[in-house]
Amino acid sequence: MYALPQHWPQWRSLAAHLNVKVGLLAEDSGGSSFDEACSLPWLRLSRQFPDAQIPLACLATTVELGGQANTDRDDALAWAEGILAFLAEQGLITGEWPKPANEPCEGMPFEGTELLLAPHPGVVSFLRKPGEWVEAGDEIFEVIDPVSDRVSTVCAGTSGVLFAIERLRYAQPGFWLAKVAGREALRHGRLLND
């Protein structure tokens, strides 16, 4: 789930309803993502004209639901119900939905995302699952080159939530295979890479 840091308090309930594992927060990650394209102009206007007291309008977020490989009907139904429950909480629709079954996840700076790269070509074997908290030094995946018998284990360099893994299982050197969202800024400038 992606959002402006200033909007995160309003999005925490949706994150809980959807069982999101991490909120990635940035004002301008580059690439004009949906949430920033809708919300950032209001933030910029309020900073440009502070005396006008322009509210931070257009609450927008980008939510990734399960990735391309997850087309499970039960998951899709749960996500749809979570979105409807959030809309009802906001008074935008009528109806009764249960409170979130999960606690809201932590919002992390998008700048704290570590990209774990393939050190060489080979078959990828993931050792951890998306959504898990990992510590710096934890083994995240192995790359096994069947031609040379070279095996490399790639570890997290930061503590945080493992929030994305590459769906393809053959590594190419220099391409990311996993992403960990940490609490401390690691990157600056253009943060979107896909």
Which residues are covered by each model-predicted region?
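Structured catalytic-domain cores with a bias toward divalent-metal coordination
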Residues: 1-194
